[in-house]
């Protein structure tokens, strides 16, 4: 393996580690809250070293904030794409179509996959605390 292959492998491993940390953190923060979740809990669930959080995020607070930034960015992009699709229709979109597109996309995280439901649980936990 040459050095470029080594670099790509490390980059791939780094992406996997970041993803595992985020997924583990999201699940645990949703269940236990920020204060109830220890770095060790996250890294054990992600099967990574506790140093990985410091390396990739700095600390638990930064990981928590990155999780919110990532999920909220995904939600915003989804809503914008849905509205762009409706707006790009050859005919002038009706108010009904616009409201339907927006509201369906707004409700989707409540009905969608487990990850979206975990984030909604985390989101409401944060709002309540």
Regions picked out by a protein language model, each given a short descriptive name:
Residues 26, 107, 124-128:
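Regular secondary-structure segments
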């Amino acid at each position: 393996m040459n050095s470029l292959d080594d670099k790509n492998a490390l980059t791939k491993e780094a992406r996997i580690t970041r993803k595992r940390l985020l997924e583990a953190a999201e699940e645990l923060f949703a269940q236990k809250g920020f204060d109830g979740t220890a770095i060790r809990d996250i890294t054990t669930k992600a099967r990574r070293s506790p140093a990985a959080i410091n390396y990739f995020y700095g600390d638990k607070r930064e990981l928590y904030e990155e999780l919110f930034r990532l999920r909220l960015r995904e939600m915003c992009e989804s809503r914008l794409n849905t509205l762009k699709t409706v707006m790009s229709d050859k005919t002038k979109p009706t108010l009904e179509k616009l409201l339907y597109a927006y509201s369906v996309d707004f409700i989707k995280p409540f009905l969608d996959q487990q990850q979206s439901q975990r984030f909604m649980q985390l989101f409401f936990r944060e709002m309540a605390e």
